[in-house]
From Swiss-Prot:
UniProt pathway: Cofactor biosynthesis; coenzyme F420 biosynthesis
Organism: Haloferax volcanii (strain ATCC 29605 / DSM 3757 / JCM 8879 / NBRC 14742 / NCIMB 2012 / VKM B-1768 / DS2) (Halobacterium volcanii)
Assembly description: Homodimer.
Example of a GO biological process term: F420-0 metabolic process
Signal peptide extent: none
Name recorded for this polypeptide: 2-phospho-L-lactate guanylyltransferase
Lineage, top ranks: Archaea, Methanobacteriati, Methanobacteriota, Stenosarchaea group, Halobacteria
Alphabetical keyword list: GTP-binding, Nucleotide-binding, Nucleotidyltransferase, Transferase
Length: 206
């Protein structure tokens, strides 16, 4: 299956600025991207990165600085070669097993909702479906599929629901991560702080 992996590499993960400077944020973002590419390939997917700035990874990269909706829409214009999947580059918890569930679910459109109402991954098999990544996009994608007469299924997966944007998301990577992104955080001095309330991520400067 062709798998499009959008990547924002120009100024990534600005909400992690309390933890990391700009160079570090880019390094961390690339480590997550590489984890996603590994997971996609492990289940037989054929990943291709679409980025707003050049990035060096073990996959074909196309530079396209248009908004996400336009970029993905362009990738879906031709489904003649079979279904197309879209998997976001910041799904640091994604595993081959989670992606296999997504890819193997039988529907015209299969979506993995993100926490907060986003759409973290899609499989599209119907030419009349289009995307809209603004706001609570999972609601829009349900509606678009219904209006286009597409069957629609959702994959309820914690590993696909967590897209790493906020400092609180680093906790999930430290607890559940299995790849480069977790290793990068540990090497950067990020650790769990257990207090009387929720566990938090803190950074020890080295």
């Amino acid at each position: 299956m062709r798998v499009v992996v959008p990547f924002g590499g120009r100024d990534p993960k600005t909400r992690l600025a309390p933890f990391f400077d700009a160079d570090e944020r880019r390094e961390f973002a690339v480590s997550m991207l590489r984890d996603v590419l590994d997971a996609v390939r492990a289940v037989g997917g054929d990943p291709a990165v679409v980025a707003d700035a050049l990035v060096t990874v073990d996959a074909p990269v196309t530079v396209d600085d248009r908004p996400l909706t336009e970029v993905v829409g362009g990738e879906l214009d031709d489904l003649g070669g079979g279904p197309v999947a879209v998997v976001m580059a910041d799904l640091a918890l994604a595993t081959p097993a989670a992606l296999s569930r997504l890819f193997e679910t039988d529907a015209d459109v299969v979506a993995a909702p993100g926490l907060g109402g986003g759409t973290n991954a899609l499989v599209v098999r119907h030419p009349e479906f289009s995307v809209d990544y603004h706001g609570a996009s999972i609601l829009d994608h349900r509606r678009i599929a219904r209006d286009a007469g597409c069957s629609f299924a959702e994959v309820d997966s914690m590993r696909l629901a967590v897209d790493v944007d906020e400092p609180s998301d680093l906790v999930e990577v430290l607890v559940h991560g299995e790849g480069r992104a977790r290793e990068w955080l540990v090497d950067a001095g990020v650790r769990l702080a257990r207090g009387s309330g929720r566990v938090e991520a803190v950074r020890e400067r080295r």
